[in-house]
Amino acid sequence: SLMKGPNGLGKPADLKRFTLLHIGSFPDDWQVWLTAAGVKGVDASRGVSFDFALAAYQAAMDGLGVALGRNPLVEPDLKAGRLVVPFEFKRSSDFAYYLVYPPEAIRRRKIKAFRDWIVSLSEVAQQAA
């Protein structure tokens, strides 16, 4: 575990000793997080980049480095103890998904059921954040 021992990950400044795992579609995430957390002396550009978030999370589970996670994607692994949240600081994301459909489609029962379901998932994720 990266958290244990005298060289473990105890505070955000310790990240300078660890590989940062980046998600290619969010190249600035580490810089934004470090700045928001007030962390100095950590080069946000270093580390390994992955095309898919789940690959970065798997690398973190394998002990290859530290990744920034999005709650809906990492929650099962946090609950199972495969991942841990090393710091109390959390940063909300401006990232969003949009459900789009033609106006008349909402009259279709399946479309309305899907919309209601996806909105309920979003509300649960917002409460967990």
For the regions a language model picked out, list residue spans one by one.
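Alpha-helix/helix-capping structural signal
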Residues: 1, 25-28, 54, 72-73
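Alpha-helical segments flanking ligand/cofactor-binding loops in enzyme cores
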Residues: 13, 57-58, 112
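Secondary-structure junction motif
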Residues: 19-37
